[in-house]
Each structure stands twice: as structure tokens, then as C-alpha cells.
Regions:
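Juxtamembrane cytosolic interface motif at the C-terminal end of transmembrane helices
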Residues: 52, 90-94, 235-242
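Alpha-helical transmembrane segments of multi-pass integral membrane proteins
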Residues: 6-12, 75-94, 111-118, 144-155
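Juxtamembrane "helix-exit" motif on the non-cytosolic side of transmembrane helices
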Residues: 17-28, 89-102, 155-162, 205-212
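Membrane-interface helix-boundary motifs at transmembrane edges
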Residues: 61-71, 130-139
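Helix-boundary and loop/linker segments of multi-pass membrane transporters
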Residues: 69, 95-105, 137-139
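Loop-to-transmembrane helix junctions at the membrane interface
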Residues: 66-73, 189-194
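Alpha-helical transmembrane segments in multi-pass membrane proteins
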Residues: 1-58, 72-82, 105-110, 218-227
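Transmembrane helix-loop-helix hairpins at the membrane interface
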Residues: 108-243
């Protein structure tokens, strides 16, 4: 648990330094900062760092790869399709802030590195570690879901407004429960990221709309697309490493 919580603390600190303090996600013109935030805080610390912790814990026999969300390729393909489908439904049912296709592509690409890191750190690392530490109690998945969701909410204090308030922490903890339900039932990291990213997309686009900068996302932003592609590659590489 100490190692898992250390990863969480380092990731939250990096998030504040590269996103929360400079208000990166509210500044569409800050392409360099967005790339730095995506690469350092999310890819290196969140995905790669979190993945290495999962690999370490599985090698020590403290948890299984499947329990952390790294099952078979077939499970992953099915879960990812379900994650995209359910995520799209939830996005539409909430009254989407935008249906502009380019805005959706840019927004999805912008939040993907963040969503991947959130799922890796809060659920694959901390959630799985909590569940393993409470076994063989039947309530272990419930306890893990509650802890992971609460930490997901608290982590947003390191973000830009309007996410860095205790009201948002409470609301996002409830959102985290939906992600917990998807992960602990489906046990797949890729599907959970797809579902979670759709939830994050709604929140980020709404915040951009309230800030009056959503229109700037109507042109494809190549740095965002590149960071999303790198994120997918990193997730697949870490998944292969854990299962090797």
C-alpha cells in the first residue's frame, strides 16, 4: 500500500505543477504545457510508473494481473467496445456541451492521457492494492471501489478551476464510483479507460464552454492527437509488459 500511495502522491504533485498551477487545460494556446503535462504527469508518472508498480506487485504475488485489469486480449477487445458504447450513451444523456465532431476529437484526445493515468493510478494501482490487502473478505472489492473513487475525487484539488473545489471533489467521487463499477465488474484497463474518458470529456468540454474558449477547439490540434496516439501505445506496451 505504501508504494501505491507514493505513486498517487507523486502523480498528484506533478499534476499540480504542470496543470493546476499554470491553469493549462483552460488555455488552448498553451500547447507546450499541455504536452508536458500529458507526457510527464500522465504518461511517465501515471501510466508507466503505475504500470511498473502493478508489475512489481504481480511479480511478488501480492495481486494478479487480471485483478488489476490486465486480462486476455479478447476480454480487452470486448470491454473496450463496451466502454466506448456506454461512454457515448452517458455523454449524450447528460446534454452534451458540444456535438461538433472536431471539438469531440480534440477534447477526447486532450483528456485521454489524463484518463489513462487516472485509471492506472486510482484503480489499477491503489484500487487493486486495497482489494488485495483486504482479501479474503467478501467486501474487498467494495472497499477498493470506495477508496479508489475517493482518491480520484481528492486528486482534482491539483487541477484547474472549476475542478479544484471540495464540491467538485464530492461530485467527482460519485463519478468515480461509475468507473469503479465498470472496472471491478469487467476487470479490464482499456475498456475502463474508454468509458472513463467519455465521462471526463463531458466535464472538460463543459468547463471550456463556461470559460468561453470552446470555439478554439473547432480546428484539429495535432499536438493533442499526437499525445493521444502515444498514450494508446504506452497503455498497450505496459499491458504487454505486465502480462509477459
Amino acid at each position: 500500500m505504501t508504494l501505491a500511495l507514493t505513486v498517487f502522491a507523486v502523480w498528484m504533485g506533478a499534476t499540480y505543477a504542470l496543470e493546476g498551477a499554470p491553469r493549462t487545460l483552460l488555455r488552448p494556446e498553451a500547447a507546450g504545457l499541455r504536452v508536458a503535462y500529458a507526457v510527464v504527469a500522465n504518461l511517465l508518472v501515471g501510466v508507466v510508473g503505475g504500470g511498473l508498480v502493478v508489475r512489481h506487485l504481480t511479480r511478488q504475488g501480492r495481486l494478479t494481473a487480471v485483478a488489476a485489469g490486465f486480462g486476455s486480449g479478447r476480454r480487452s477487445a470486448v470491454a473496450t467496445a463496451m466502454g466506448f458504447a456506454l461512454g457515448a450513451i452517458v455523454y449524450l444523456l447528460q446534454g452534451p456541451p458540444s456535438l461538433h465532431p472536431i471539438v469531440l476529437v480534440n477534447g477526447f484526445a486532450q483528456v485521454l492521457p489524463v484518463s489513462a493515468a487516472e485509471v492506472f493510478v486510482c484503480w489499477a494501482v491503489v484500487g487493486a492494492a486495497v482489494e488485495a490487502s483486504w482479501r479474503p473478505r467478501q467486501a474487498s472489492p467494495v472497499i477498493a471501489a470506495l477508496v479508489a473513487s475517493a482518491l480520484f475525487g481528492v486528486y482534482h484539488l491539483a487541477h484547474s478551476p472549476p475542478f479544484n473545489t471540495w464540491t467538485m471533489v464530492g461530485a467527482l467521487t460519485m463519478v468515480g464510483l461509475g468507473t469503479s463499477l465498470f472496472l471491478f465488474l469487467g476487470r479490464d484497463i482499456s475498456g475502463t479507460i474508454a468509458f472513463h474518458n467519455a465521462l471526463a470529456l463531458f466535464g472538460v468540454l463543459r468547463a471550456l464552454g463556461e470559460a468561453g474558449v470552446l470555439g478554439r477547439y473547432e480546428t484539429l490540434q495535432l499536438p493533442l492527437l499526437a499525445s493521444a496516439i502515444v498514450t494508446v501505445g504506452a497503455v498497450l506496451a505496459v499491458r504487454r509488459l505486465i502480462r509477459s
